[in-house]
From Swiss-Prot:
Protein encoded by which gene: rpsN
GO BP, sorted A to Z: translation
Name under which the protein is recorded: Small ribosomal subunit protein uS14
SUPFAM superfamilies registered for this protein in UniProt: Glucocorticoid receptor-like (DNA-binding domain)
Claim: Ion transport is one of the keywords in the record: no
Keyword RNA-binding included in the entry's annotation: yes
Stored HAMAP family: Ribosomal_uS14_1
GO cellular component: cytoplasm; small ribosomal subunit
GO molecular function: rRNA binding; structural constituent of ribosome
Keywords: Ribonucleoprotein, Ribosomal protein, RNA-binding, rRNA-binding
Oligomeric and partner information: Part of the 30S ribosomal subunit. Contacts proteins S3 and S10.
Cited function: Binds 16S rRNA, required for the assembly of 30S particles and may also be responsible for determining the conformation of the 16S rRNA at the A site.
UniProt xrefs under PROSITE patterns: RIBOSOMAL_S14
Family: Belongs to the universal ribosomal protein uS14 family.
Length: 101
């Protein structure tokens, strides 16, 4: 089980990234738009730098829904590999069977 503080910190980052998603994407698009003047692009970059660090979506870490483990994460199930294997062996994940050939 991951530390509760790490899980809570990540949840806080998710909320902040979601709150600033529109503004962040508009500024990023303006900063990368080659048709704009160089000064306008620079202004967009400076405004992006003024946003809170946790508003950046790359700071959000995918974590297991059951344990909070950050590594070995399967997006389709939102579980880490250990919990996925455990639940699949118990038959609690529909459509997942043990491989046999």
């Amino acid at each position: 089980m991951a530390k509760l503080s790490s899980i809570n910190k990540n949840e806080k980052r998710k909320k902040m990234a979601k709150a600033y998603a529109g503004k962040y994407s508009r500024l990023k698009a303006a900063a990368n738009d080659k048709s704009l003047d160089e000064t306008d692009r620079l202004v967009a970059r400076l405004k992006m730098a003024e946003l809170p660090r946790n508003a950046n979506p790359t700071r959000v870490r995918n974590r297991c829904a059951l344990t909070g483990r950050p590594r070995g994460y399967y997006r389709k199930f939102q579980l880490c590999r250990i919990q996925l294997r455990d639940l699949a062996n118990k038959g609690l994940i529909p459509g997942v069977t043990k491989s046999s050939w």
